[in-house]
Amino acid sequence: MMALPKAGIIFNDIKPAAARAAAELTEKFQDAGYRVYQTTGWGGILGFPRPDSPVCHTPIDRLAAEGFDEAMPFAIVLGGDGTVLAAARQVAPFDIPLLTINTGHMGFLTEGYLNQIHPAIDTLLAGQYALEDRSMIEVRVFRDERLIWEALALNEAVLHKEPLSGICHFEVAIGRHNIVDIAADGVIVATPTGSTAYALSAGGPVITPDVQVLQLIPICPHSLAARGLVFADTESLVVHPPTNHQHLILSLDGNSGCYIWPGDQVRIRRARYRTRLIRLQPPEFFALLREKLGWGLPHIAKPLSVELP
């Protein structure tokens, strides 16, 4: 007897609307002959570090909940962008495509809204969709050449000082090129997907998702010569933290990650995994910039979370 196909649901259990939708979809998929596996976005949350416990994490390929594996053809994400980022971290090692439904605020990474969920699922089950691949980064922390922490990020990795501490001097090496010194409050290493997140707020450029690059953006640099840098994602990057600070904080996709001590190395490269997004309509990145961020609109206009003409 053949096993039933799998369907995954990852939802933000803090939001009642997402929890209700998860229950409705479970019944819908079961009626369609699927085995349904549920989990929350908490599985992809990296936790809150403490200086005396810097390795509070799970290895990259062990974040997924039971039932989420290569045999799962898709998973539904119910939440905002934070839930999507956490879900991507969980399922990327198994190449599971995600259909993302917004129950949050911005919804920059989501495909549809909650009031569109049932026709969206019908379209999905009919196989009428395309896949859009997004690159990720793999972040590893080494201490005395020993790996102590690792994680995936879809948006960015941020290494920054704690509040009320002085300016930092980061030594950064890209590929085999000379090490550069960056005097700043922190540095951001972002993917094209992350170019519309923290990197944008720090003065970085918007990069379309299909471009195979990474970007290095200083946070509040103390130099007129310090500018963001876009480079090929075939290059790896190593950040040496400053020696005049007891510790720094490394965070990924807005999550706490771990503390970085003097002498540690933060090594970042394009991940061998990817995030696969299910698209029910051909993606239109520039329309999304206009809708969500107000790109190209008159300065008196404000972006709305609705489709604009």
Curated annotation (Swiss-Prot):
The keyword Nucleotidyltransferase is annotated on this UniProt entry: no
Subcellular location: Cytoplasm
Keywords from the named record: ATP-binding, Cytoplasm, Kinase, NAD, NADP, Nucleotide-binding, Transferase
Protein name: NAD kinase 2
E.C. number(s) listed in UniProt: 2.7.1.23
Single GO biological process annotation from the record: NADP biosynthetic process
Reaction(s) catalysed (UniProt annotation): NAD(+) + ATP = ADP + NADP(+) + H(+)
Top-level class of the enzyme under EC nomenclature: transferase
Classification via InterPro entries: ATP-NAD_kinase_N (IPR017438), ATP-NAD_kinase_PpnK-typ_C (IPR017437), NAD/diacylglycerol_kinase_sf (IPR016064), NADK (IPR002504)
GO molecular function, one term: metal ion binding
Cofactor: a divalent metal cation
GO cellular component, one term: cytoplasm
Record function comment: Involved in the regulation of the intracellular balance of NAD and NADP, and is a key enzyme in the biosynthesis of NADP. Catalyzes specifically the phosphorylation on 2'-hydroxyl of the adenosine moiety of NAD to yield NADP.
Binding annotation for NAD(+): 81-82, 155-156, 185, 196-201, 255
